[in-house]
Protein backbone atom coordinates (compact mmCIF):
# COMPACT_ATOMS: atom_id res chain seq x y z
CA UNK A 1 0.00 0.00 0.00
CA UNK A 2 1.12 3.51 -0.69
CA UNK A 3 1.50 6.11 2.01
CA UNK A 4 -1.97 7.34 3.00
CA UNK A 5 -3.82 5.21 0.48
CA UNK A 6 -7.51 4.44 0.95
CA UNK A 7 -8.83 0.88 0.88
CA UNK A 8 -12.53 0.10 0.84
CA UNK A 9 -14.20 -3.23 1.25
CA UNK A 10 -16.20 -4.91 -1.50
CA UNK A 11 -19.71 -3.53 -2.07
CA UNK A 12 -21.58 -6.85 -1.94
CA UNK A 13 -24.92 -5.41 -3.03
CA UNK A 14 -23.24 -3.70 -5.98
CA UNK A 15 -21.43 -6.91 -6.88
CA UNK A 16 -24.65 -8.96 -6.72
CA UNK A 17 -26.68 -6.43 -8.71
CA UNK A 18 -23.94 -5.97 -11.31
CA UNK A 19 -23.49 -9.71 -11.71
CA UNK A 20 -27.22 -10.25 -12.24
CA UNK A 21 -27.37 -7.46 -14.83
CA UNK A 22 -24.23 -8.79 -16.56
CA UNK A 23 -25.68 -12.32 -16.70
CA UNK A 24 -28.97 -11.02 -18.08
CA UNK A 25 -27.15 -9.04 -20.74
CA UNK A 26 -24.97 -11.98 -21.73
CA UNK A 27 -28.05 -14.20 -22.01
CA UNK A 28 -29.53 -11.78 -24.56
CA UNK A 29 -26.26 -11.81 -26.52
CA UNK A 30 -25.73 -15.57 -26.49
CA UNK A 31 -29.31 -16.70 -27.15
CA UNK A 32 -31.72 -13.80 -27.63
CA UNK A 33 -34.59 -16.13 -28.57
CA UNK A 34 -34.40 -18.10 -25.31
CA UNK A 35 -33.84 -14.96 -23.24
CA UNK A 36 -36.87 -13.36 -24.88
CA UNK A 37 -38.98 -16.36 -23.86
CA UNK A 38 -37.73 -16.09 -20.27
CA UNK A 39 -38.98 -12.50 -20.26
CA UNK A 40 -42.50 -13.56 -21.19
CA UNK A 41 -42.68 -13.69 -25.00
CA UNK A 42 -43.46 -17.21 -26.26
CA UNK A 43 -43.23 -16.22 -29.94
CA UNK A 44 -40.10 -15.90 -32.07
CA UNK A 45 -39.15 -12.23 -32.43
CA UNK A 46 -38.72 -10.57 -35.82
CA UNK A 47 -35.18 -9.82 -37.04
CA UNK A 48 -35.62 -6.19 -35.99
CA UNK A 49 -36.71 -7.27 -32.52
CA UNK A 50 -33.69 -9.61 -32.34
CA UNK A 51 -31.43 -6.65 -33.12
CA UNK A 52 -33.02 -4.68 -30.29
CA UNK A 53 -32.72 -7.64 -27.91
CA UNK A 54 -29.00 -7.87 -28.67
CA UNK A 55 -28.61 -4.11 -28.21
CA UNK A 56 -30.29 -4.43 -24.83
CA UNK A 57 -27.92 -7.31 -24.08
CA UNK A 58 -24.84 -5.21 -24.85
CA UNK A 59 -26.18 -2.37 -22.72
CA UNK A 60 -26.99 -4.59 -19.75
CA UNK A 61 -23.73 -6.54 -19.98
CA UNK A 62 -21.73 -3.30 -20.06
CA UNK A 63 -23.57 -1.67 -17.15
CA UNK A 64 -23.46 -4.90 -15.14
CA UNK A 65 -19.74 -5.45 -15.73
CA UNK A 66 -18.86 -1.88 -14.79
CA UNK A 67 -21.09 -1.95 -11.70
CA UNK A 68 -19.61 -5.27 -10.56
CA UNK A 69 -16.08 -4.04 -11.31
CA UNK A 70 -16.52 -0.87 -9.26
CA UNK A 71 -18.01 -2.93 -6.42
CA UNK A 72 -15.07 -5.36 -6.44
CA UNK A 73 -12.52 -2.53 -6.38
CA UNK A 74 -14.33 -0.78 -3.52
CA UNK A 75 -15.05 2.26 -5.71
CA UNK A 76 -18.28 4.25 -5.66
CA UNK A 77 -21.08 2.37 -7.39
CA UNK A 78 -23.66 5.17 -7.21
CA UNK A 79 -23.23 6.28 -10.82
CA UNK A 80 -23.52 2.73 -12.15
CA UNK A 81 -26.63 2.14 -10.06
CA UNK A 82 -28.12 5.28 -11.63
CA UNK A 83 -27.15 4.04 -15.10
CA UNK A 84 -28.85 0.74 -14.29
CA UNK A 85 -32.01 2.53 -13.11
CA UNK A 86 -31.93 4.73 -16.21
CA UNK A 87 -31.77 1.69 -18.49
CA UNK A 88 -34.79 0.23 -16.71
CA UNK A 89 -36.67 3.54 -16.99
CA UNK A 90 -36.10 3.41 -20.76
CA UNK A 91 -37.40 -0.17 -20.84
CA UNK A 92 -40.46 0.72 -18.75
CA UNK A 93 -41.34 3.80 -20.82
CA UNK A 94 -40.90 1.82 -24.04
CA UNK A 95 -42.99 -1.02 -22.66
CA UNK A 96 -45.74 1.30 -21.49
CA UNK A 97 -46.08 2.68 -25.02
CA UNK A 98 -47.11 -0.81 -26.22
CA UNK A 99 -48.75 -1.97 -22.99
CA UNK A 100 -52.08 -2.80 -24.62
CA UNK A 101 -50.34 -4.98 -27.22
CA UNK A 102 -48.42 -7.06 -24.67
CA UNK A 103 -49.60 -10.41 -23.39
CA UNK A 104 -50.29 -10.56 -19.63
CA UNK A 105 -47.07 -12.55 -19.05
CA UNK A 106 -45.07 -9.88 -20.88
CA UNK A 107 -46.73 -7.14 -18.86
CA UNK A 108 -45.93 -8.83 -15.57
CA UNK A 109 -42.42 -10.05 -16.32
CA UNK A 110 -41.18 -7.30 -18.65
CA UNK A 111 -42.76 -4.23 -17.13
CA UNK A 112 -42.67 -5.59 -13.58
CA UNK A 113 -38.99 -6.46 -13.98
CA UNK A 114 -38.23 -2.95 -15.22
CA UNK A 115 -40.10 -1.42 -12.26
CA UNK A 116 -38.17 -3.59 -9.79
CA UNK A 117 -34.92 -2.70 -11.58
CA UNK A 118 -35.68 1.01 -11.22
CA UNK A 119 -36.25 0.58 -7.50
CA UNK A 120 -33.06 -1.43 -7.04
CA UNK A 121 -31.03 1.08 -9.05
CA UNK A 122 -32.36 4.10 -7.18
CA UNK A 123 -31.92 2.44 -3.80
CA UNK A 124 -28.39 1.39 -4.73
CA UNK A 125 -27.57 4.98 -5.67
CA UNK A 126 -28.94 6.65 -2.52
CA UNK A 127 -28.40 3.99 0.15
CA UNK A 128 -26.14 4.88 3.03
CA UNK A 129 -22.63 3.62 2.66
CA UNK A 130 -21.85 1.18 5.44
CA UNK A 131 -18.40 0.40 4.11
CA UNK A 132 -15.97 2.43 6.20
CA UNK A 133 -12.80 3.50 4.49
CA UNK A 134 -9.69 2.26 6.22
CA UNK A 135 -6.62 4.39 6.03
CA UNK A 136 -3.39 2.48 5.65
CA UNK A 137 -0.18 4.26 6.52
CA UNK A 138 3.12 2.62 5.78
CA UNK A 139 6.34 3.98 7.14
CA UNK A 140 9.53 4.24 5.19
CA UNK A 141 12.37 2.12 6.64
CA UNK A 142 15.02 4.12 8.48
CA UNK A 143 18.29 4.57 6.54
Regions found by a protein language model. Name each.
Residues 1-143:
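Short amphipathic, positively biased membrane-proximal segments
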